């Protein structure tokens, strides 16, 4: 008996010790599962709180804790990094899914025996095995949808890669440059934490080492890189903004030389203005885009650290506005006086981006060769999966579409439904949503199909809401009654969705709470469910309904029916040689000025001066800003701003500033250089291919975003380049890269004058780097040369509108 009593006492002591040690372990390692779930709910944006059950977040926290316990680096990750960069499910504005579990099961054995840095590289190889780059629309696919599709734009690739890294317990975050300074467009990539330090990598674009990607050079010319960190984060980085849901931090110091500008805002008497909004704007896509927005403190001050280039400061308070160009690295203290004057009627501004800087990490030839071998193998795995897809537009979602077409009774309207939703919808839409949109009506009119039949309202994740609303709102017989229902029942929360995530329409109905965008999506979704044509106006973002041949704006505050008070604007432009038909977002944009702030009019990407503005376009009455810009090969931009007021018929002169400088010889390249011709498999000289005269030489990389962009930009000018008639020689650096390239994707879109080949032993690349004094081997590189060995144009790295830049040079030759 004594022995039994002794054993019982010992067991109690052991259990007590286990409990105490468990508590100490939890204190050292972090918090309990419920504490992490509570942390998520404390800072969770409203749509995530309403659209997903608590069990979803509990499961994902369990998976995070499992990865922490099972991965060899789990105990080395500090609590701050684990809490903010592993536990959160959301990366960007994607639809949340169960990728953490799927990815962990696929990756855990692949990375278990590796160091943390090697594990990051290995995860990126896995990502490349499944996903490559291809542009798409603004809605961000979920990680599992991207996996199913096998491609995505950079925002989707980086969301996918961050999700994969977090699944195995590696802290990771998506880094975004909201806009490049030296060219149009933006970019997103990944930072991952290992052994006490953050490293960057190109998502789904594996390199042999960390801190290396095609964007190194572009990033060195960047002016702002940021990331939104879930919750109240207290790391060492500069804080740009704190909201109820996230902390936005500035990480530009990791990529480029920086400087700080301190801003003081004063009133007419020179007294500091508290609470003035100061927007830091970067020229991109033919507008001054706000990359940072700050409020002045009690002393009227704020600041920003950025790359050493030009921005436009735009300060507003109570309708008063002041703008001023600043140069980071030159200007240190800037005072903006809100003196009651509005924007100047017209002004010319020259914007200069930062220069190239920075050094690339060392990569041995052996490392590069092994990485190329692995990438070729990974390409083959992905292509084998893609070969199973019978319909390109449906990608990996083809079984869902086939099921729908087999089950639907109204075949004609089923085909119309598939034609009015986006291509991205076809790739990830669920069977439930398709069946929810079945109709017994046969109406193929544009109004019905686009604004009643289609479930797509904006950039929201599609859900099966129509049958739900027909049941719940069956008492509503007029669209005016639906507006009244929204007015009386839906409250607006302006604080708990700062990212403007799209709240599901059924959640809005259940919660009776959302933000302005959520209310608009809800209204349109409910209206279509009840048979009322409705939309969100793609230009000004206002919700509208269609009645009696007229579109009416929805006003949740007023009872009366209001059609838009429209006037006609005509842009008077005299075409010049290089810009016979300026393009929206490339050469010009229009913004409406509301309380001193510029609100961009979001016309379709294909909008042009001749097609949309030459003969007049209807706009609401008010004050507007016309921005035009001419971007030079150096990245510098010649900007013109024109402010005007619309009332009745209004004509505004449209000005494109020109750079009339003739092409100059800037270097040399031996036209007798040999390359391996892709078609003949023979070595040939450039001269023997091009004949005497000018030609274009491009050194490109397979399946990389900068090259893909460049080739697509060139394709826009296919006809003009064929009329020019000169050859364009496009070379890969080696045969491995040439074999990895998807010729089928580009051959039909490029000019017939294109010749493909491989640089023999890298001789041409070496000469280009030396002769053009290029500091890095970033690709692509495009040159305009002649066979007398003269180079008159050179552009390296990531750029937008390359085709236009080449044509400008060609027309001057």
Predicted regions and their residues:
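Short Pro-Gly-centered beta-turn/loop motif in secreted/extracellular proteins
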Residues: 301-312, 317-320, 326-329, 607-634, ...
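Secondary-structure boundary elements
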Residues: 29-149, 185, 369-371, 375-511
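A short, hydrophobic beta-strand/beta-hairpin element that forms part of a small beta-sheet core
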Residues: 778-796
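Short, ordered, surface-exposed loop/turn motifs in non-cytosolic proteins
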Residues: 268-287, 308-309, 576-604
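Short active-site neighborhood of thiol/selenol oxidoreductases, capturing the structured segment around
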Residues: 686-710, 714, 727-731
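Hydrophobic/aromatic-rich core segments of domains that either
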Residues: 105, 109-115, 119-125, 134-144, ...
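Short, internal strand/loop/helix patches
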Residues: 744-779
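Short, acidic Ser/Thr/Gly-rich low-complexity loop/linker segments typical of extracellular
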Residues: 284-305, 595-613
């Amino acid at each position: 008996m004594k022995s039994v009593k002794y054993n019982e006492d010992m067991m109690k002591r052991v259990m007590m010790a286990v409990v105490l040690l468990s508590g100490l372990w939890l204190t050292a390692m972090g918090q309990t599962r419920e504490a992490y779930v509570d942390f998520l709910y404390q800072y969770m944006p409203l749509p995530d709180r309403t659209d997903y059950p608590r069990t979803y977040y509990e499961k994902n926290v369990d998976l995070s804790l499992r990865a922490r316990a099972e991965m060899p680096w789990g105990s080395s990750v500090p609590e701050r990094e684990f809490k903010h960069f592993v536990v959160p499910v959301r990366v960007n504005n994607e639809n949340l899914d169960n990728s953490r579990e799927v990815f962990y099961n696929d990756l855990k054995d692949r990375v278990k025996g590796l160091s943390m840095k090697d594990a990051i590289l290995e995860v990126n190889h896995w990502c490349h095995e499944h996903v490559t780059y291809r542009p798409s629309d603004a809605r961000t696919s979920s990680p599992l949808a991207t996996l199913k599709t096998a491609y995505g734009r950079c925002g989707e690739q980086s969301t996918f890669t961050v999700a994969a890294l977090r699944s195995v317990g590696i802290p990771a975050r998506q880094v975004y440059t909201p806009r490049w300074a030296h060219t149009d467009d933006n970019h997103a990539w990944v930072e991952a934490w290992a052994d006490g330090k953050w490293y960057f990598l190109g998502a789904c674009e594996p390199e042999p080492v960390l801190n290396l990607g095609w964007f190194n050079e572009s990033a060195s010319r960047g002016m702002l890189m940021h990331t939104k960190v879930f919750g109240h984060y207290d790391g060492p980085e500069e804080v740009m903004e704190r909201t109820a849901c996230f902390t936005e931090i500035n990480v530009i110091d990791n990529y480029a030389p920086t400087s700080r500008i301190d801003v003081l805002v004063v009133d007419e008497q020179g007294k500091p203005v508290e609470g003035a909004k100061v927007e830091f704007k970067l020229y991109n896509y033919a507008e001054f885009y706000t990359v940072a927005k700050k409020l002045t403190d009690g002393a009227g001050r704020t600041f920003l650290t950025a790359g050493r280039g030009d921005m436009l400061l735009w300060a507003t308070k109570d309708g008063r506005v002041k703008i001023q160009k600043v140069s980071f690295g030159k200007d240190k203290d800037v005072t903006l006086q809100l003196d009651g004057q509005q924007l100047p009627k017209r002004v010319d501004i020259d914007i200069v981006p930062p220069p190239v800087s920075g050094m690339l990490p060392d990569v041995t030839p052996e490392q590069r060769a092994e990485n190329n071998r692995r990438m070729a193998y990974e390409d083959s795995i992905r292509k084998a999966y893609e070969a199973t897809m019978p319909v390109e537009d449906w990608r990996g979602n083809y079984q869902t579409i086939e099921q729908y077409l087999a089950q639907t009774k109204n075949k004609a309207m089923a085909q119309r439904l598939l034609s009015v939703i986006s291509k991205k919808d076809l790739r990830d839409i669920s069977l439930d949503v398709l069946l929810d949109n079945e109709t017994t009506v046969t109406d193929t009119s544009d109004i019905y199909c686009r604004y009643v039949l289609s479930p797509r309202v904006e950039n929201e994740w599609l859900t099966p809401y129509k049958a739900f609303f027909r049941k719940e709102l069956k008492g509503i017989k007029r669209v005016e009654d639906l507006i009244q229902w929204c007015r009386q029942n839906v409250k607006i929360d302006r604080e708990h969705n700062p990212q403007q995530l799209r709240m599901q329409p059924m959640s809005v109905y259940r919660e009776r709470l959302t933000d302005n965008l959520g209310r608009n999506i809800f209204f349109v979704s409910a209206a279509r469910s009840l048979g009322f044509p409705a939309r969100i106006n793609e230009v000004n973002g206002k919700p509208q309904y269609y009645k009696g041949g007229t579109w009416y704006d929805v006003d949740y505050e007023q009872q009366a029916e209001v059609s838009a008070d429209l006037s006609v604007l005509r842009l008077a432009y005299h075409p010049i040689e290089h810009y016979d038909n300026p393009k929206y977002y490339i050469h010009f944009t229009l913004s409406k000025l509301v309380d001193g702030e510029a609100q961009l009019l979001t016309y379709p990407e294909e909008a042009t001066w001749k097609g949309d503005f030459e003969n007049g376009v209807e706009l609401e009455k008010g004050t507007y800003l016309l921005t035009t810009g001419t971007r030079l090969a150096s990245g510098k931009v010649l900007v013109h701003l024109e402010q005007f007021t619309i009332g009745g018929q209004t004509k505004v002169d449209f000005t494109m500033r020109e750079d009339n400088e003739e092409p100059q010889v800037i270097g040399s390249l031996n036209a007798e250089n040999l390359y391996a011709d892709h078609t003949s498999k023979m070595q040939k000289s450039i001269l023997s291919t091009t004949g005497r005269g000018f030609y274009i030489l491009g050194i490109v990389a397979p399946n990389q975003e900068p090259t893909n962009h460049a080739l697509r930009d060139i394709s826009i000018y296919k006809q003009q380049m064929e009329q020019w008639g000169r050859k364009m020689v496009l070379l890969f650096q080696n045969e491995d890269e040439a074999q990895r390239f998807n010729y089928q994707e580009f051959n039909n879109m490029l000019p017939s004058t294109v010749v493909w080949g491989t640089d023999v032993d890298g001789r041409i690349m070496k000469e280009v780097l030396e002769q053009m004094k290029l500091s890095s081997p970033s690709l692509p590189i495009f040159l305009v040369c002649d066979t007398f060995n003269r180079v008159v144009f050179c552009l390296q790295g990531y750029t937008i509108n390359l085709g236009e830049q080449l044509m400008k040079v060609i027309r001057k030759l």
